[in-house]
């Protein structure tokens, strides 16, 4: 179905001059072949229309002759049929109704007022799908990293818990040894005191010497206790 040529179709939508080696999109916009090549020089695809971002466009076989792909023919036939929600457009349809799976043209969308939430351009839907896929990949990577960190934290906590339990057992053992030593020394000191009390009075003639010897014995006992405690703490 050929469309009449007019002033708007005779100019390239990018350079606004007469198109050289014309390329016509399914949506009706015309471009120079060189302009389109420069426009998409750094893109890998998809390649929507540079003017309206329609995601389906074809190149003309001959200058001035519109492309007649199967998809374009189907859309033009749908546009020529009576529309349910508004007048049909003469250009290729740009939108698809996701709720009813039926095509809707740009003219019908403009006549309907604000864009309803169930209508969405195909190129925008594809772009959103890529963004969602990238977000999911990032979230999956973050989740895996968090699991690895959690596992490392649990392992470190288990190791430190083992160290604390070992130190606690060692401290209890040292405390029991020190307490038993003090009890033994106390009994030994009491026995020595009882022996001293049972000596005859003539052997206690010099109380100063006896008191000095007792002080020396007490000092040696305290020194022995202090050295033993330090040695246990340093183990």
Curated annotation (Swiss-Prot):
Family matches, as InterPro entries: TRIM/RBCC, Znf_RING, Znf_RING/FYVE/PHD, Znf_RING_CS
Gene Ontology CC entries for this record: cytoplasm; cytosol; nucleoplasm; nucleus
EC id: 2.3.2.27
Major localization class: cytoplasm
Effect of residue 224 to R: No detectable effect on ubiquitination. Marked decrease in ubiquitination, but no effect on subcellular location
Residues carrying Asymmetric dimethylarginine: 98, 109
Keyword entries, A-Z: Cytoplasm, Isopeptide bond, Metal-binding, Methylation, Nucleus, Transferase, Ubl conjugation, Ubl conjugation pathway, Zinc, Zinc-finger
Pfam families registered for this protein in UniProt: zf-C3HC4_4
Zinc finger (RING-type): 12-53
DNA-binding recorded as keyword: no
Annotated catalysed reactions: S-ubiquitinyl-[E2 ubiquitin-conjugating enzyme]-L-cysteine + [acceptor protein]-L-lysine = [E2 ubiquitin-conjugating enzyme]-L-cysteine + N(6)-ubiquitinyl-[acceptor protein]-L-lysine
Subcellular location field: Cytoplasm; Nucleus
PTM info: Ubiquitinated; undergoes 'Lys-48'-linked autoubiquitination in the absence of growth factors and MAP3K1-induced 'Lys-63'-linked polyubiquitination. 'Lys-48'-autoubiquitination leads to degradation by the proteasome, while MAP3K1-induced 'Lys-63'-linked polyubiquitination results in the stabilization of the protein. 'Lys-48'- and 'Lys-63'-linked polyubiquitinations occur most probably on the same 3 C-terminal lysine residues (Lys-195, Lys-223 and Lys-224) and are thus mutually exclusive. Other sites of ubiquitination are not excluded. Arginine methylation by PRMT1 stabilizes RNF187 by facilitating K63-linked ubiquitin chain formation, and enables dimerization, c-Jun interaction and subsequent AP1 target gene expression.
Covalent link (Glycyl lysine isopeptide (Lys-Gly) (interchain with G-Cter in ubiquitin)) residue numbers: 195, 223-224
Domain-related comment: The RING-type zinc finger domain is required for E3 ligase activity.
Database matches in PANTHER family: E3 UBIQUITIN-PROTEIN LIGASE TRIM
Protein name as catalogued: E3 ubiquitin-protein ligase RNF187
Organism of this sequence: Homo sapiens
Organism lineage string: Eukaryota, Metazoa, Chordata, Craniata, Vertebrata
């Amino acid at each position: 179905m050929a469309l009449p040529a007019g002033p708007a179709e005779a100019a390239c939508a990018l350079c606004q001059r007469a198109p050289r080696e014309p390329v016509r999109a399914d949506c009706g916009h015309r471009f120079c072949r060189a302009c389109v090549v420069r426009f998409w020089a750094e893109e890998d695809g998809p390649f929507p229309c540079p003017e309206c971002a329609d995601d389906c466009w074809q190149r003309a076989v001959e200058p001035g002759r519109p492309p007649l792909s199967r998809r374009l023919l189907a859309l033009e036939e749908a546009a020529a049929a009576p529309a349910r929600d508004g007048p049909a457009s003469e250009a290729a349809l740009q939108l698809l109704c996701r709720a009813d799976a039926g095509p809707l043209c740009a003219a019908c969308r403009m006549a309907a007022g604000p864009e309803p939430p169930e209508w969405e351009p195909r190129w925008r839907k594809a772009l959103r799908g890529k963004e969602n896929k990238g977000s999911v990949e990032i979230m999956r990577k973050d989740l895996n990293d968090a699991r690895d960190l959690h596992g490392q934290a649990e392992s470190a906590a288990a190791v430190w818990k083992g160290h604390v339990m070992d130190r606690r057992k060692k401290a209890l053992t040292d405390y029991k040894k020190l307490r038993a030593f003090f009890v033994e020394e106390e009994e030994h000191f009491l026995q020595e005191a009882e022996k001293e009390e049972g000596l005859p009075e003539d052997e206690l003639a010099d109380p100063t010497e006896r008191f000095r010897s007792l002080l020396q014995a007490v000092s040696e006992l305290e020194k022995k206790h202090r050295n033993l405690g330090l040695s246990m703490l340093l183990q």
